[in-house]
Amino acid sequence: MSWRDSGNPEGGGAERYLQKMATGLVALGCRVTVFTVKYAGAPTDEVIDGVRYVRAGSKLSVYPLAAWNLLRRRFGRVDVVVDIQNGLPFFTPLGTRRPIVVLVHHVHREQWQVVYPGRGGRIGWWVESRLAPWLYRGRQYVAVSRATRAELRELGVTGPRVAVVHNGTEPVVSVETRKTAHPSICVVGRLVPHKQVEHAIDATRALLPEFPELRLRIVGSGWWEDDLRAYAPDLVARGVVVFEGHVSEQRKQQIYEESWVMALPSLKEGWGLVVGEAAAHRTPTVAYRSAGGTQESIVDGVSGLLVDTEHEFATALGDLLRDDERREVLAKGALKHSYGFTWEHSQAAFARVLSEAVQGRLIDDQDAADAADAIPAG
């Protein structure tokens, strides 16, 4: 159960994780169905890479529809349900008695009031922080980082039942390009308020006097794009800030390869999938320590830089643009760190969690995988 799939225009790293875990399970011989929201141009029922996608409902109605369809057994025989909670749960315990595994990328404590100021945000946070831990008491959880696991513990998800399965890193896509001759920064991700792309724009403006040829390329789309364009119309008009939009995988890899450094000003990241993607192209990242998962996807001072304030964010970007030697050291460190996370290992670890859940066992391991034993025969 997922609020989006990887084909959704608003999809991001969480949906890439879903896609990878689903195809990994199919490769092990599992039958996988993903129930998600319907969006323009997408079939209501299709199979991609062996994974069945069933789409229905709207941004909010998809949640009760999940439990209803489970209750009516519209997905056929189900052995285990993965309830992906991106803030809101799918209430799957109301629709099935089968084992349920709850997947959480990060806790949305700060984001609720950013996206839904006032009562809406307070209700959303109550559902996530109070109702969901009670509804899924005793269920198996999967967190994508130790930081997320710690946040879940604070919400009362206690006991040896929160496994950690990290994101992987994509194999490097060969692109015929090299780092730009002029200083360049990229931001990659959904354009929504909590990604705080404004911080990267502000940093670019502050650094322009020293680096007049500096360019900031913003890759991705989202409902906040118009607000971002209006935030710095002069920089957009001068071509200093370039909105690339939703690009092909090849184009994204090209931008990673060309950029001197990636800025990740996000308020919250369960892991930061783009960190590994950029690292594979020897592009280090500057991010906020408080984002959570960045403390694991980035080794501070080795594969990138972690900062605490917006001023430090701009300063760190400037330091890396200015210091070729330090940037090269971090580039090598980023590439080396990215080798430590593969999708194949993550897929096997995730499959093991599901296998244990089917057999009624809870686990609390980190990236523990035995692909050969992940899915029991039959």
Each PLM stretch: what is its role?
Residues G120-Y141:
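Membrane-proximal helix-turn-helix segments that form the acceptor-binding/catalytic region
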Residues V142, V173-R205, R217:
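Conserved donor-binding/catalytic core segment of Leloir-type glycosyltransferases
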Residues A147, G168:
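Carbohydrate-associated surface elements
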Residues R229-V247:
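Nucleotide-activated donor-binding/catalytic signature segment of Leloir-type glycosyltransferases, i.e.
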Residues H246-V247, Q254-S259:
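Short alpha-helical donor nucleotide-sugar binding micro-motif in glycosyltransferases
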Residues L267:
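Aromatic "clamp/platform" in nucleotide-sugar-dependent glycosyltransferases that forms part
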Residues P284-Y288:
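Short hydrophobic beta-strand element within catalytic cores of glycosyltransferases
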Residues D300-H311, D319-E325:
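Conserved acidic donor-binding segment of nucleotide-sugar-dependent glycosyltransferases
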